[in-house]
Amino acid sequence: SPAMPVPGPMGPMGPRGPPGSPGASGPQGFTGPPGEPGEAGSAGAMGPRGPAGPPGKNGEDGESGKPGRGGERGPPGPQGARGFSGLDGAKGDSGPAGPKGESGAPGENGTPGAMGPRGLPGERGRTGAAGAAGARGNDGAAGAAGPPGPTGPAGPPGFPGGPGAKGDAGAQGGRGPEGPAGARGEPGNPGPAGAAGPSGNPGTDGAAGPKGTPGAAGVAGAPGFPGPRGPSGPQGAAGAPGPKGNTGEVGAPGAKGEAGAKGEAGAPGVQGPPGPSGEEGKRGARGEPGAAGARGAPGERGGPGGRGFPGSDGPAGPKGATGERGAPGAVGPKGATGESGRTGEPGLPGAKGMTGSPGSPGPDGKTGPAGPSGQDGRPGPPGPVGARGQPGVMGFPGPKGAAGEGGKPGERGVMGPTGAAGAPGKDGDVGAPGPSGPAGPAGERGEQGPAGAPGFQGLPGPQGALGETGKPGEQGLPGEAGATGPAGARGDRGFPGERGAPGALGPAGARGSPGSXGNDGAKGDAGAPGAPGAQGPPGLQGMPGERGAAGLPGLRGDRGDQGAKGADGAPGKDGPRGLTGPLGLPGPAGATGDKGEPGPAGPVGPGGARGAPGERGESGPPGPAGFAGPPGADGQPGAKGEAGDNGAKGDAGPPGAAGPTGAPGPQGPVGNTGPKGARGAAGPPGATGFPGAAGRVGPPGPSGNPGPPGPAGGPGKEGPKGNRGETGPAGRTGEVGAAGPPGPAGEKSAGLPGPQGLAGQRGLPGQRGERGFPGLPGPAXEPGKPGPSGPGGERGPPGPMGPPGLAGAPGEPGREGSPGNEGSAGRDGAAGPKGDRGESGPSGAPGAPGPPGAPGPVGPAGKNGDRGETGPAGPAGSAGPAGPRGPAGALGLRGDKGESGEAGERGMKGHRGFTGMQGPPGPAGSSGEQGPAGAAGPAGPRGPAGSAGSPGKDGMSGLPGPTGPPGPRSGEMGPAGPPGPPGPPGAPGAPGGGFDLGFLSQPQEKAPDPYRMYDDANVLRDRDLEVDSTLKSLSQQLEQLRSPDGTRFTYSVLEDGCTSHTGTWGKLPLLDLAPMDVGAPDQEFGLEVGPVCFL
């Protein structure tokens, strides 16, 4: 049977087609560049005189005039300042002694003299009477500290201090011993089915099963191959001639006969497929001239003509603009001498004279009165300790302590509400140019512009009318044989042949490949119970407890790295039809089709409308230069275009100059607490503390390895239509694809039959076919003439070949035969009728790109595209100038507690005092005897932070430590008497057994975060969970206060009485807790807090 045809490779590119008919006229070209400047015109007439220039610069100063005449005497000047004293005159001679005068009147008392020196101390006078008590003097300055007095008795314990700030996490403890094995957990839910494992090796063959019941009849198998031909039977007796038999099988081809006489020409065969293009034929004889063609398209615009002759002079131009200011003129001649000046005013007073010499000393004064008494002497040595005084009045509350240290930064709060819109930012960079606005209305016609540059090549014009049929060329050489035609459709089923003899048994087939694994079998019966196992080793730490309630959603994390690409989703629905794409480049010229036969002439059509004007013809020779026309009127301004889009953001400007200093801001709130003081000396070691509560869950571990990609997601919703992308660059030509499936049979009529292939090798004998249906009886033959019955002859030679029988059913295709020898070329057949139009050939290689088309008019503005994705962050701008210092922030929230300090020793239990206000601490007393261990002391000063250890596993709670030995007691405890009057408060001793809930927060346990409540229906459920978890955490911590035997008093709260929720949060206001007389000195007590309402 003929082999299936395979499409051949693409043929070579056909010859270039004839040039297309001229294209339509192109659009008006762009305005050309301005022409070269014309030559300068002749000089205009002289303009009128310009306006006067501005005044020139001042001339240089003239030379000095001659001195004027002397002025008249001026009026007297004002009184001058007093001159310096003159020097003392020389001492005069002594005069003669005068006569004694009379006694004068007593003079006035002289002024008291300066105080004389201190007199010697007088003798001690007698003791005077005691004066009245003076008013209380001001407090003296504090004296130097006296030596410490003896230790007073221990005072009652003060109230516990407020909780200290939370300490930093301590260093990681060592890992505790492994606990006993926990109880076995309940079986988990069955996991999902694992992926199918690889096929196992084939097992050994099992024993043969019992014979199954016969199955239902199977579908009839395909017909087997024909069996080998059976041996000939013995010759039978000659029968009577039977009816005409069915056609026999085709015999083997006979030997080649001699050539017969030339037959008559057959009917023309069906046209074969077109052969490949022949080589170019010789040029035919020149045809007759055709009819005149249509008028050609106008040629391209000619280049600019030669330069014209200069025109005649134009009229005089308008008056010129005012000239620039002239240069300064030369210096003028020297001026005449001026008049004399006025007389000058009197001068300023002279400088002060020098100081005179000092006078002689005066006489001594009288003795002054005694001076005040001297200062007090130094304090004497301390006196003995006085008797114990009465208790003082309760003091006023002390001043507010200094603010504690700033807390550690709190956890990041919930995202706040969106802030108000910020002030407008700086002007952005200039945006990219916006799209062109719509064209404005046309202005009035301007003057004729200079000649434009030649326009771009126009688009190809429409197809011209068909030319007349050319004369036939010379006959080409015969083409090569075409490719083998496709296989014909399958013929009708032939009549069934006789049933063949059974074939021999075929060899056993090869062993089949192992089958796929069967489904799981039914569950087997339970096996017998095994023997009990030996005691196993203790198990590992038990499974974690039940999962706690869900926490609040965390803050939004930073954006994760881009995940791995997921598996391709199922294809989405078809999107909406896209916009029409841009016009493609013109394809390469197709091969010239066969020329059609001329159709009948149509009737004459009506006259067409007037055609568009042709392109401008070539320039004629330049005419003589015309006179210059008057200037045309200015055109009206065009309409204002729409504003373009905002430009891109400009570069940041240089920083502005510093502004003036602003007015001082308002007084800021109290600043943060100052730095922490230096660490105090460590106290004596404290008693063993209670075991800490279980630590909080450690920080999340490092990210696990990325999981396998998730299953493909379902198809997404139909996305919005994307913006139209820009046309991408042309891809490179792809490689030849694999051969496609054979197309449907074309409409071509059958090709010429190909040469006969060599006979294929004989197929394997087929299995015995099913019994065919009985054939139809053949047509009755003519009866033979009865011959004389001869004796039985021997078997004669084979008779001549009978006529060929009808075609049997087509056998299965044989293997492809080897190609036959090339036959000799047949004679040229007569030309067949014109074939139907062939199917489009494969696309040729892309032609060279055509010239660019003329730019089209500006299209209407498109709709705004969807908002683009956020672009990558731009580079950071340069830092702006520092802003003014903002006001001080509000006082921060109270920070976490500091680390626990080292515990102090336990003090003795004091007598019960008044419940007074907490006094200031007294000086440290000397250590008393070792008393019984007190409760844990308050938190000490915060130690320096150790380097944070890596978080250890949460250890199991340790067993309670042993109780310390009791201290010595004075005597047996007598029966309790009635409470006596309160005793005086003792001097403060070393800090003792006050006790503070802060000790519950162990260094590695962070107290529960204060919870927030919102008035929002969606948050109610979360809030309830959060309240639960907070209270559960509190109760777990307080549970560690239980007494050693586990008994405790509990007061349960049975309902939540909260009726309103304010949206604010509050701390549980347990400000202080002072257990009084709980029992024995080392008695523990418990406290459990249930739900609370804030009123």
Swiss-Prot record:
Residues 22-49, 127-145, 180-223, 232-270, 288-297, 385-400, 477-489, 498-544, 577-592, 625-661, 675-697, 804-822, 872-893, 924-960 have a biased composition (Low complexity). Keywords: Collagen, Extracellular matrix, Secreted. It holds the Pfam family COLFI. The keyword Transferase does not apply. Residues 161-179, 299-311, 602-611 have a biased composition (Gly residues). One of its GO terms (cellular component) is extracellular matrix. Residues 1-1011 are annotated as: Disordered. It is found in: Secreted, Extracellular space, Extracellular matrix. Residues 58-72, 894-908 have a biased composition (Basic and acidic residues). Belongs to the fibrillar collagen family. This is Collagen, type I, alpha 1a. It comes from Epinephelus caninus (Dogtooth grouper).
